[in-house]
């Protein structure tokens, strides 16, 4: 990324030649990420950081379903997700924080019990950034799909380390 901070800092959306070259680089990066997680390139959106990506997912779930004001997440999410969830509570949302087992795993039965008719989103990291524990994303996503609830996973710690196939996981975002 360093060349894009120091010498290739143009606007990839611009109509001039320098911007066109950057567009090609950006498209190539989008293709690489899509290949890594078995997604379509058009499904890849770049943001400034993981926090922005996660907050955007929460916001999109709530704004597109204004009648749903409940979110389910875990007590061991990244600090930025916990902080945003607490902020959403101050704005009138209800947030259920699922506990983890002594070994750091999630009890999927508790997830099923936590989902309500007004649940807008379930958010769960794929791999814990502190313990390395892998959460059962395929199973959690299937539970959410069966209940008609959007499912978000922060997979940044898992990408490139475990196989991620967003087409098989039923992940919403």
Language model region names:
Residues 1-173:
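Pyridoxal 5′-phosphate
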């Amino acid at each position: 990324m360093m060349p894009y901070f120091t010498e290739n800092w143009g606007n990839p959306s611009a109509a001039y030649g320098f911007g066109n070259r950057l567009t090609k680089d950006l498209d190539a990066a989008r293709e690489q990420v899509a290949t890594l997680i078995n997604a379509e390139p058009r499904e890849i959106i770049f943001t400034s950081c993981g926090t922005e990506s996660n907050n955007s997912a929460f916001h999109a779930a709530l704004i597109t379903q204004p009648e749903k004001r409940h979110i389910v997440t875990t007590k061991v999410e990244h600090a930025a997700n916990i902080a945003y969830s607490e902020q959403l509570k101050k704005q009138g949302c209800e947030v259920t924080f699922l506990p983890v087992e002594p070994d750091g795993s999630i009890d999927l039965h508790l997830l099923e019990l936590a989902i309500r008719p007004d649940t807008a989103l379930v958010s769960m990291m794929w791999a814990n950034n502190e313990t390395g524990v892998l959460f059962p994303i395929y199973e959690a996503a299937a539970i959410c799909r069966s209940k008609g609830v959007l499912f978000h996973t922060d997979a940044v710690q898992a990408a490139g380390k475990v196989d991620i196939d967003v087409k098989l996981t039923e992940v919403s975002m």
